[in-house]
From Swiss-Prot:
Residues 1-41 form a transit peptide. It comes from Homo sapiens (Human). Its EC number is 6.3.5.-. It catalyses: L-glutamyl-tRNA(Gln) + L-glutamine + ATP + H2O = L-glutaminyl-tRNA(Gln) + L-glutamate + ADP + phosphate + H(+). GO terms for biological process: glutaminyl-tRNAGln biosynthesis via transamidation; mitochondrial translation. The modification N6-succinyllysine is found at residue 529. GO terms for cellular component: glutamyl-tRNA(Gln) amidotransferase complex; mitochondrion. Allows the formation of correctly charged Gln-tRNA(Gln) through the transamidation of misacylated Glu-tRNA(Gln) in the mitochondria. The reaction takes place in the presence of glutamine and ATP through an activated gamma-phospho-Glu-tRNA(Gln). It is linked to Combined oxidative phosphorylation deficiency 41: An autosomal recessive mitochondrial disorder characterized by prenatal onset, fetal hydrops, intrauterine growth retardation, hypertrophic cardiomyopathy, respiratory insufficiency, lactic acidosis, and decreased activities of mitochondrial respiratory complexes I, III, IV, and V. The disorder is lethal, with death occurring in the perinatal period. It holds the Pfam family GatB_N. Keywords: ATP-binding, Ligase, Mitochondrion, Nucleotide-binding, Primary mitochondrial disease, Protein biosynthesis, Transit peptide. This is Glutamyl-tRNA(Gln) amidotransferase subunit B, mitochondrial. Belongs to the GatB/GatE family. GatB subfamily.
Length: 557
């Protein structure tokens, strides 16, 4: 039976940032031996009582979890890394394969300039040092969807090294505090993608599609500075937003444009690092968090029961919610790395090293690319907070949901309502409806202009808040009516006749003398009860602000 999930302190999952309670994920985890030999701070993990064959008592020691990531992002380019074949998702099988992609003898690689520029741009955005000279290598292994028997990558000297990624972790019971956390980036390297193996169980066949073979990849190696699934998922989501903002990768995990391998180990604080396992090909942020948390708990259970952790590769079964062994790595695989003989060193320049009279089309200028960097998500969040006075966690949510920031900005442009009111309606009402029906922003039946018109009606006190929600429900039905038409048809306008409201308030006061007495006796709830009675008599069409003013005047408050 699968081991129970570990109860982490950072349980409340949000797309934009992780929740951390009790400090269990506030400290950095120690790195595994896979990507760094430095010892960092450790994060303790709450332990559940387990049966064990060891002599130590249960709960005597805490556990520290260590998580590192290898992220493969498919570069947004018209052609592949070393050939002129097109890159297009869902093309017919083997319809985008050049002679080089199929590894026919005599074919040679030609480096794609766009892929190099994308790697430099990504490295700069992630605070990396860009190597002016980088090298290509062959990584040998046999698999059916790798026709050459090797992959061209950058093992010795990658294009970018020593960067950092800052992401936000939301802490506290009300999620009101965003704590910045940093994960180091070991390197970014250019490499080829492999083809796809398609398994036909009905015919007991494995079919090969080479359309993806040779597509340019950015491999981003994150040092093991994370300590739970939520931290890893949040870091990957932030990287995804950065890649999309840069335009260097669409980073659509559903289409395999962003794939993650997680290296995970556990140990007692102050003791040597544990044996790590690698969970491969995680293609969803939600599954990434689940797989890491499960694997951490599985390792703890195994060690508490007197077992040992194998250095192995595992996969995540999303239906069962557990990791499963694929192959062990005890006999370390020899990839026989060697320099790529058909590619010279990749040489880049900056403003100081650029040769005089160099053709801009023949060289890549690092400083020139730096000047073209677009606004990054962190800067956008700061602007949202400063310009609209919203909470930082709200800015995370706006950026995190695809298309939501653009929707919000379009509403802001078309309405007179205050930004805080727009923020509340977009993040609470609008986003809530989307989540209930599992819709993307682009699939919403409510347009920015319709919501803007509704907020204008509310802001001008033409309708009440309850009526506005009723109008929104009608808009969601896709009947093609405007908010103004709905208000008119259902007679939802607030009563503006001062004389009629005064008469109505007088009638309610006469009908409820005890409530009037309570108001005069300074009962704070009594005035609200009177307001409610008046609004009930008008089917909620009376403006509560006007009612309160009239009642206070009549009662001499």
């Amino acid at each position: 039976m699968a081991a129970p999930m570990l109860r982490w302190g950072c349980r409340g999952r949000r797309w934009a940032f992780a929740r951390v309670d009790g400090g269990s994920c506030h400290r950095r985890g120690a790195p595994t031996g896979s990507t760094s030999n430095q010892i960092r701070g450790e994060s303790s993990v709450a332990q559940q009582p387990l049966h064990t064959a060891q002599k130590t008592r249960k709960g005597e020691h805490k556990w520290a979890a260590v998580v590192g990531l290898e992220i493969h992002a498919q570069i947004s380019s018209n052609s592949k890394l070393f050939s002129g074949s097109q890159v297009r998702f869902s093309a017919p099988p083997n319809s985008l394969v050049s002679f080089f992609d199929a590894s026919l003898p005599g074919t040679l690689p030609v480096l794609n300039r766009r892929c190099v520029e994308a790697a430099v741009m990504t490295g700069l955005a992630l605070n990396c040092h860009i190597n002016k000279k980088s090298l290509f290598d062959r990584k040998h292994y046999f698999y059916a969807d790798l026709p050459a028997g090797y992959q061209i990558t950058q093992q010795r000297l990658p294009i970018a090294v020593n960067g950092s990624l800052i992401y936000g972790v939301c802490a506290g019971k009300k999620q009101s505090q965003v704590i910045p956390k940093t994960v180091r980036i070991k390197q970014i390297q250019l490499e080829q993608d492999s083809g796809k193996s398609l398994h036909d169980n009905l015919r007991s066949q494995t079919l090969i599609d080479l359309n993806r073979a040779g597509v340019g990849l950015l491999e981003v190696v994150l040092e093991p500075d994370m300590s739970c699934g939520e931290e890893a998922a949040t870091a990957v989501r932030e990287l995804q937003l950065i890649l999309q903002a840069l335009g260097t990768s669409q980073a659509n995990m559903a289409e395999g444009q962003l794939r993650v391998d997680a290296n995970i180990s556990v140990h007692h604080p102050g003791e040597p690092l544990g044996v790590r396992t690698e969970v491969k090909n995680l293609n969803s942020i939600r599954f990434l968090a689940k797989a890491i948390d499960y694997e951490i708990q599985r390792q703890i259970n195994e060690l508490e029961n007197g077992g040992e952790i194998l250095n192995e590769t595992r996969s995540f079964h999303h239906k069962l919610g557990c990791t499963m062994s694929m192959r062990d790595k005890e006999g370390k695989q020899d990839y026989r790395f060697m320099p790529e003989p058909n590619l010279p060193p990749l040489v880049l320049y900056d403003a100081t090293s650029l040769p005089a009279g160099a053709d801009p089309q023949q060289v890549i200028n690092i400083d020139q690319i730096r000047e073209t960097l677009p606004e990054l998500p962190s800067v956008t969040r700061e602007k949202l907070v400063q310009q609209y006075g919203m909470l930082l966690e709200h800015s995370f949510t706006l950026l995190n949901e695809v298309g939501l920031l653009e929707f919000f900005q379009n509403v802001i442009k078309e309405t007179r309502a205050e930004p805080k009111k727009v923020t509340s309606w977009v993040l609470n009402t609008f986003l809530g409806y989307l989540k209930q029906q599992n819709l993307a922003v682009s699939e919403s039946p409510v347009t920015p202009s319709a919501l803007a018109e509704l907020l204008d009606l509310l802001d001008s006190r033409t309708i009440s808040s309850s009526a506005a929600k009723q109008v929104f429900e009608e808009l969601w039905k896709r009947e093609g009516k405007t908010p103004g038409q709905i208000v008119s048809e259902k007679q939802l306008e607030l009563m503006q006749d001062q004389g009629a409201l005064e008469q109505l308030c007088h009638s309610v006061m006469e009908a409820h003398p005890q409530v009037v007495m309570d108001v005069k006796n300074r009962n704070p709830r009594a005035i609200n009860k009177l307001i409610g009675l008046v609004r009930k008599a008008t089917q909620s069409r009376a403006d509560p602000v006007m009612i309160k003013e009239i009642l206070e005047k009549k009662l001499s408050l």
